[in-house]
Amino acid sequence: MELQAVCGAEELRDGQRAKAFDVLYHGEPVRAFAVRHDGVVHAYLNRCTHVAMEMDWQPDQFFDDTGQWLLCASHGAAYAPDTGACVGGPCRGGLVKVPVQERAGVVYWCVEWPFERLVF
């Protein structure tokens, strides 16, 4: 399995700013984001399940004011940060999880089907 660095682990703090990165998902370029919740890093495609559009109006701002839920800024859909499950608002299922690992102070995403590294 190929690992691609996303950011330094210290850049992600519980319930705060995310770190965006690019992936190919089924051959299509898509933004993804990594967040930390309860000390664990999670990552998802940056696509609301209500309408397939990016969720953040302000770059890297996904958490609500409490730092407990991921929100779509456009329509208010709310998702659990640890599972991506829809917990409220207009959504059709959960977020697509991107596999990540935290090793030696670095957060990596795991390049494996249906995800591919985006090469410019």
Residue ranges and their predicted role:
Residues 89-90:
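Axial heme c-ligation environment in periplasmic c-type cytochrome domains
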Residues 1-66, 80-81, 94-120:
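N-terminal pre-ligand scaffold of iron-sulfur
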Residues 85-86:
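A conserved acidic, glycine/proline-rich C-terminal tail/linker
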Residues 48, 72-75:
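Short cysteine clusters
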